[in-house]
Regions:
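Proteins that catalyze or organize thiol-disulfide redox chemistry
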Residues: 1-54, 61-108
Length: 108
């Protein structure tokens, strides 16, 4: 994980998304090219919005229970949570500008 993002696991997921901060969870896998393209933009956004937004990266191969629980069928899938509840789901790679637009209403 980068210095601004948090590694999520099946064991820590509920605690992480229950954070008082809005939380964007990136469901990804090591073998997924589009997932790797998201690393830079997600790390930059996590740094830019530190203290306003938490970004969690969850490897679906290492943590299949959470991916199954939330019905993640393709990756990358990103979900925005507030107080433990899913608020928005984004399937597929996005640019930094697109991601910033998607999270803007949660961090204002």
């Amino acid at each position: 994980m980068g210095q601004n993002t948090v590694k999520g696991t099946d064991a820590t997921f509920s605690e992480l998304v229950g954070s008082p901060l809005p939380t964007l969870v990136d469901f990804w896998a090591e073998w997924c090219g589009p997932c790797k393209m998201m690393d830079g933009p997600l790390e930059e956004i996590a740094g830019d919005l530190a203290g306003k937004l938490q970004i969690v990266k969850l490897n679906v191969d290492e943590n299949p229970a959470t991916a199954m629980q939330y019905g993640v069928m393709s990756i990358p899938t990103m979900m925005i949570f507030q107080a433990g509840q899913e608020q928005k789901r984004l399937v597929g790679a996005r640019s930094k500008a697109q991601l910033e637009s998607e999270v803007a209403s949660f961090v204002s």
